């Protein structure tokens, strides 16, 4: 008895579909970077396009490919999530002969050691994001992204408070910036993503450092009293809007990646969870290094 291949059946009302696939696949991944193995639990989404002449995509092939590539990554160590995403992307096009486009997205939580001002060591969580896209015959593009949390302090409220307090206590005006002024503050969540050609490497740790260094202050999982005071003082000596965070990151990207091509895409997204409002503050820039360089030259 001949088995019917329902997916390959022709249909009359056919329209091409941009992405068809599976989402939310969780797999263990070992990334070898900086001389050490990083054990991550990755969430993976994979897609291919579907021509108008085909009823369905062969979903089981996607699971098979992911399983094969994860197994191979244990034996042949991968350097990054985006490298693994790219390898999966290529294999998707090999197995889905009807597809002209493939896309893989991956995310994982990642921990780095940090030190508080007193020297206490802590392991702090960050989020890694990777994406790879390939068009048959047109090569591969990959994206590396990070998400970090920290603290911002509002500069507008700070100046207003300083003005009002100086009216009541004139001596404060003489101190100027020597004493940090009170303000409302926020937990900030910022994402930085860069899309580069297949052969270009961008280090995730560098992106995390850029994001953390652009906030009013990093935050930590554990803080004793002195460290807690230092975090608060540091943030209020370095007040920032979400707009400031995004612009500071863009400036650091230009300095750090002078040799990358103008075509490299950059996305910076920052959101602060307001403490005195019921809404959040948000800022974003989606651009290329070329556009940023043109803006800098003006």
Regions found by a protein language model. Give the residues of each.
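N-terminal intrinsically disordered, cationic/polar leader segments
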Residues: 1-298
């Amino acid at each position: 008895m001949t088995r019917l291949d329902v997916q390959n059946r022709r249909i009359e009302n056919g329209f091409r579909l941009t992405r068809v696939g599976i989402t939310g696949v969780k797999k263990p991944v070992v990334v070898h970077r900086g001389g050490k193995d990083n054990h991550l639990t990755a969430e993976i989404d994979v897609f291919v396009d579907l021509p108008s002449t085909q009823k369905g995509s062969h979903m089981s092939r996607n699971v098979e490919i992911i399983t094969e590539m994860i197994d191979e990554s244990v034996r042949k160590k991968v350097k990054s999530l985006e490298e693994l995403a790219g390898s999966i992307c290529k294999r998707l096009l090999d197995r889905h002969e009807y597809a002209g486009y493939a896309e893989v997205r991956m995310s994982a939580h990642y921990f780095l050691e940090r030190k508080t001002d007193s020297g206490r060591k802590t392991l702090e969580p960050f989020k890694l994001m990777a994406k790879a896209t390939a068009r048959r015959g047109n090569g591969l593009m990959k994206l590396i992204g990070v998400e970090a949390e920290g603290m911002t302090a509002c500069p507008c409220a700070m100046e207003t408070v300083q003005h009002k307090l100086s009216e009541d206590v004139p001596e404060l005006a003489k101190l100027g910036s020597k004493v940090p002024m009170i303000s409302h503050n926020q937990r900030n969540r910022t994402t930085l993503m860069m899309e580069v050609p297949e052969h270009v490497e961008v280090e995730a740790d560098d992106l995390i450092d850029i994001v953390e260094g652009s906030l009013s202050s990093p935050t930590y999982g554990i803080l004793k009293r002195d460290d807690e005071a230092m975090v608060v003082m540091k943030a209020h000596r370095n007040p920032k809007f979400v707009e400031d965070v995004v612009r500071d990151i863009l400036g650091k990207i230009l300095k750090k990646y002078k040799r990358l091509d103008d075509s490299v895409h950059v996305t910076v997204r920052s959101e602060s969870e307001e403490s005195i409002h019921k809404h959040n503050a948000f800022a974003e820039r989606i651009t290329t290094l070329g556009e940023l360089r043109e803006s800098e030259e003006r």
